[in-house]
Amino acid sequence: LIVFLVWLPSGARALLIAALQAQRVLVGMIFLFALIALSLLWTAGQRLDTWVFLLINLRGYHPKWLDHVVWLATQVGNMVTAFLLAGLFFVLNYRSLAVEVIFGTLTLWLLVETIKALTDRARPFLALEGTRIIGWRERGRSFPSGHTAQTFFLMTLLSHRFQLDVGGTAALYAVAFLVGFTRMYVGAHYPRDVIGGAVLGSVWGVLAMLVDPYWLGLRF
């Protein structure tokens, strides 16, 4: 949050601070993320994490065609996808939204990488023998899931910006949950990495919503 505030222009920062004072739900979400991060110290939590991860990654039906579909689906959470989406919005004359997507993506990436360095949690394929790896071996640490955080950030922001109804919002979040599931399926993340990423991405999306009037007021 501090990183986000430092990067924001002064006008947007003042707007955000004022809005935060009335956002108890957002504060609760930040607190929830902190609890998830602290739970990494819980031994029983690691055992549960491992059990659920192996259930999704190793057990059950895993045909080759499904592996390919899941690998493609997980790319929705890639930063490249976000930049391509921002480019599309720019071409379609949603320029403030394009800038918001790029700014939010970059600051979220910086935050995720900082938290990963602090928590220093190894990827499951480094700790669990026999883990199935679909695609390439992801670099870096495991908590939180950057792909999941990125997807939840985008879906939260887009749902707000386009004022989607319940059905549209549910469809966007269904995609976000799917990306979270794929991160375990491809062997890149534990369940708590995904849950933490979902909460963090949602927080970033809400923060983007709060400063949305600032971006709408700029000319691009």
Where are these regions (language model features)?
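Alpha-helical transmembrane segments of integral membrane proteins
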Residues: L26, V70, S96-G104, G167-A171, ...
